Amino acid sequence: MLKTRIIPCLDVADGRVVKGVNFVDLRDAGDPVEAARAYDAAGADELCFLDIHATHENRGTMYDLVTRTAEQCFMPLTVGGGVRTHQDVRALLLAGADKVSFNSAAVADPGVVAEAADRFGSQCIVVAIDAKTVAPGRWEIFTHGGRRATGIDAVAFACEMASRGAGEILLTSMDRDGTRAGFNLPLTRAISDAVPIPVIASGGVGTLDHLVEGVTEGGASAVLAASIFHFGEFTIGEAKAHMAAAGIPVRLA
């Protein structure tokens, strides 16, 4: 049985790790290179690096910072933010990323995901979906760092991305982001059930039980968290031990 991955996320703005609530009210959480080194030593399964202002500011990802972060990581590194073309994917892979995440660009031009998957393989192409509840059982995608409504149904879009060659979905509930109230489990379950590829649950972790629920109730293949790890509330080791005790297969450090 595949092991469930625990993935800390570095949301990076102006060269610093930040953490917000509902995509705003950002709080400084440290240096990304130092954070990468610490998470690698702590036994994280992967690391997610998101340049959260790149698309909104209409610029590319911070390649130098990605390279310096990757140099500290022996675990797989997923990088997103400002990724628009297959050339961007190539540049990030060369900078040290193991996987590259499309977000706003995949909504604007779904074909870019297929092109990147054809060139580099589905295994390194992630599509990040930022979704907000708009009605019971219905979730809409927002782009540009959560600033722009699209009118696109999140479940249908996830299915399209899987069919176009995405290897993984990084699913963030905007309603739950930074709230510490737990994952949006109906959203996570709906998309996990709808697509044949792994889903990373993101947005809302405040306790170790929330990580367990993302897998047992949400059906996620991996769970992502930020603030519970960044501010020292729990360690990666504690999270893995808690999940293992709940019967979830994890790679123990």
From Swiss-Prot:
Keywords: Amino-acid biosynthesis, Cytoplasm, Histidine biosynthesis, Lyase. GO terms for cellular component: cytoplasm. One of its GO terms (biological process) is L-histidine biosynthetic process. It catalyses: 5-[(5-phospho-1-deoxy-D-ribulos-1-ylimino)methylamino]-1-(5-phospho-beta-D-ribosyl)imidazole-4-carboxamide + L-glutamine = D-erythro-1-(imidazol-4-yl)glycerol 3-phosphate + 5-amino-1-(5-phospho-beta-D-ribosyl)imidazole-4-carboxamide + L-glutamate + H(+). SUPFAM superfamilies: Ribulose-phoshate binding barrel. It is found in: Cytoplasm. HAMAP family: HisF. NCBIfam families: hisF. Belongs to the HisA/HisF family. This is Imidazole glycerol phosphate synthase subunit HisF. It comes from Cereibacter sphaeroides (strain ATCC 17023 / DSM 158 / JCM 6121 / CCUG 31486 / LMG 2827 / NBRC 12203 / NCIMB 8253 / ATH 2.4.1.) (Rhodobacter sphaeroides). The gene is hisF.
